[in-house]
């Protein structure tokens, strides 16, 4: 499971997810990618479930890149605890994903296999996603 080795602070503010992703909106490493269409927190368990779904479908072929990392801790208070008395204990880790971010990339397989693998991965995530090719994003090719 993905998580930071060490962090400066155990608890973080929730923050806001306004606007579109600044970077990571194009397919750089692989040939095909899975692009987020909505803002969300993606947990390390969801990332791992999506990775397993992709690699199981592709069997031995292809390479997968995970372009998001769960670096933000989220906290939760125990059940039936009254309000107040401090912030809850760290519960897990999330990656903040904004619309336009390419979360996963695949190379070394045919387009049909990549499309199906990324479709299976998208069902493990709590947001709407889009299949993108390397040359499609932005309307022109990436070679220039």
UniProtKB/Swiss-Prot annotation:
Pfam families: Ribosomal_L16. Signal peptide: none annotated. The keyword RNA-binding applies. Keywords: Ribonucleoprotein, Ribosomal protein, RNA-binding, rRNA-binding, tRNA-binding. InterPro entries: Ribosomal_uL16, Ribosomal_uL16_bact-type, Ribosomal_uL16_CS, Ribosomal_uL16_dom, Ribosomal_uL16_sf. One of its GO terms (biological process) is translation. Binds 23S rRNA and is also seen to make contacts with the A and possibly P site tRNAs. Belongs to the universal ribosomal protein uL16 family. HAMAP family: Ribosomal_uL16. This is Large ribosomal subunit protein uL16. It comes from Anoxybacillus flavithermus (strain DSM 21510 / WK1).
């Amino acid at each position: 499971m993905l998580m930071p080795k060490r962090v400066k602070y155990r608890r973080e503010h929730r923050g806001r997810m306004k606007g579109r992703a600044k970077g990571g909106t194009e397919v750089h490493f692989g040939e095909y990618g899975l692009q987020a269409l909505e803002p969300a927190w993606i947990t390390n368990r969801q990332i791992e479930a999506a990775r397993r779904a992709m690699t199981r479908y592709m069997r031995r072929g292809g390479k997968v890149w995970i372009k998001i990392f769960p670096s933000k801790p989220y906290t939760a208070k125990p059940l039936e605890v009254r309000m107040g008395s401090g912030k809850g204990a760290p519960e897990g880790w999330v990656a903040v994903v904004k619309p336009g971010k390419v979360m996963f990339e695949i190379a070394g397989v045919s387009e049909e296999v990549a499309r199906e693998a990324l479709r299976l991965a998208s069902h493990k995530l709590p947001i709407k996603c889009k299949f993108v090719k390397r040359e499609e994003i932005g309307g022109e090719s990436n070679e220039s």
